[in-house]
C-alpha cells in the first residue's frame, strides 16, 4: 500500500494505491530486517537470526518450481530509461536468488515469435514462466512500446504468470 498523510493531527491516512500487481514490499522488508539485524550486531550479542522473511520467501520460490517440467523463470523488468535508479531491476535480482533457475530480462527484450506463436527472450529461449515487475494496467494501455501484446497476443503461450492479469483489478489506477 502507498499512503499519504497531511501531518495534521486527526486527519486520516489517504490511500494512494494498492500495489497488488508489483509486490515488492516483502523483498524490501526482508532487506530491512536483515540489515537492521546486522547493524545492531545481534548475532554478537547471542541472538539468533531475528525474523525470517527472506528465508521463507526463498524457500517458497523453490517449492513452487521444484515440480515444474520447465523450471526456468524469466524475471522481466523495465530498462534504465524508464527506471534510472534501477529499483525494479534490483527487486527482480533479489527474486533471482530465491528461484533456482532464473533469467533477468528487460521487458523490452521479450520477443513474440510469429511462426511458433510464442514468447521468447532475446536468446530465443521460450518463456514459460514469467514474473514481470511492470504493472498490468501499463501493459494493456502501452501500445506504443508493444508491451500490450504480452497480454493480447497469445497470452496463453506463457504457462505461468507469477502475478496474473486479474491482479490489475486490485491495483489499477486508471
What are these regions (language model features)?
Residues 4-9, 24-174:
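Domain-scale recognition of functional cores that engage charged ligands
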Residues 14-19:
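Short hydrophobic beta-strand that contains or immediately precedes a catalytic carboxylate
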Amino acid at each position: 500500500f502507498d499512503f499519504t498523510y497531511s501531518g495534521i493531527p486527526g486527519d486520516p491516512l489517504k490511500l494512494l494505491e494498492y500495489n497488488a500487481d508489483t509486490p515488492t514490499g516483502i523483498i524490501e522488508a526482508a532487506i530491512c530486517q536483515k540489515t537492521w539485524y546486522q547493524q545492531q550486531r545481534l548475532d554478537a550479542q547471542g541472538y539468533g537470526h531475528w525474523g525470517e522473511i527472506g528465508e521463507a520467501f526463498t524457500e517458497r520460490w523453490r517449492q513452487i518450481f521444484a515440480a515444474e517440467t520447465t523450471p526456468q523463470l524469466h524475471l522481466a523488468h523495465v530498462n534504465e530509461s524508464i527506471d534510472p535508479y534501477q529499483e525494479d531491476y534490483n527487486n527482480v535480482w533479489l527474486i533471482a536468488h530465491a528461484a533456482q533457475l532464473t533469467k533477468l530480462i528487460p521487458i523490452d527484450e521479450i520477443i513474440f515469435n510469429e511462426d511458433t506463436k510464442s514468447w521468447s527472450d532475446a536468446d530465443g529461449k521460450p518463456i514459460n514462466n514469467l514474473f514481470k515487475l511492470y504493472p498490468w494496467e501499463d501493459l494493456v494501455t502501452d501500445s506504443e512500446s508493444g508491451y500490450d501484446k504480452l497480454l493480447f497476443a497469445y497470452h496463453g503461450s506463457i504457462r505461468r504468470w507469477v502475478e496474473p492479469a486479474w491482479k490489475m483489478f486490485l491495483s489499477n489506477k486508471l
